[in-house]
């Protein structure tokens, strides 16, 4: 986006394969949560050259509207996940980016 029309936004989309068994639980205040790791692999063009892109991204889905859809997520499911990213502290105190899903779509 041009400097003269700068909007701050946080949108992130990633296609990948579920690489960890989803963890599903309900918080004490009744909000449903599902967490898993999405593994992405692709070929991207950068500076006129092809390069492999690869990452593992933790995904957090929160809200009762996701309960039914997340029941079908298993290791090996291919998904498109759209949401925003935020930093979380891991158990050992390191910062880690997490994709907070707002939409998911199964890819055949």
Curated annotation (Swiss-Prot):
This is Replication restart protein PriB. CDD domains: SSB_OBF. One of its GO terms (molecular function) is single-stranded DNA binding. GO terms for biological process: DNA replication, synthesis of primer. Homodimer. Interacts with PriA and DnaT. Component of the replication restart primosome. Primosome assembly occurs via a 'hand-off' mechanism. PriA binds to replication forks, subsequently PriB then DnaT bind; DnaT then displaces ssDNA to generate the helicase loading substrate. The keyword rRNA processing does not apply. Involved in the restart of stalled replication forks, which reloads the replicative helicase on sites other than the origin of replication; the PriA-PriB pathway is the major replication restart pathway. During primosome assembly it facilitates complex formation between PriA and DnaT on DNA; stabilizes PriA on DNA. Stimulates the DNA unwinding activity of PriA helicase. Belongs to the PriB family. Residues 8-108 form the SSB domain. It comes from Pasteurella multocida (strain Pm70). Keywords: DNA replication, DNA-binding, Primosome. The gene is priB. Gene3D superfamilies: Nucleic acid-binding proteins (2.40.50.140). GO terms for cellular component: primosome complex.
């Amino acid at each position: 986006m041009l400097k003269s029309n700068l909007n701050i936004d946080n949108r992130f989309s990633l296609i990948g394969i579920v690489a960890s068994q989803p963890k599903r639980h309900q918080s004490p205040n009744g909000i449903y949560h599902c967490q898993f790791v999405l593994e992405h692999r692709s070929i991207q063009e950068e500076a006129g050259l092809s390069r492999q892109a690869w990452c593992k991204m933790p995904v957090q889905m929160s809200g009762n509207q996701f309960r039914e859809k997340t029941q079908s997520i298993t290791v090996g499911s291919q998904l498109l996940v759209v949401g925003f990213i935020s930093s979380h502290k891991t158990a050992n105190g390191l910062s880690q980016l997490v994709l907070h899903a707002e939409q998911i779509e199964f890819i055949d």
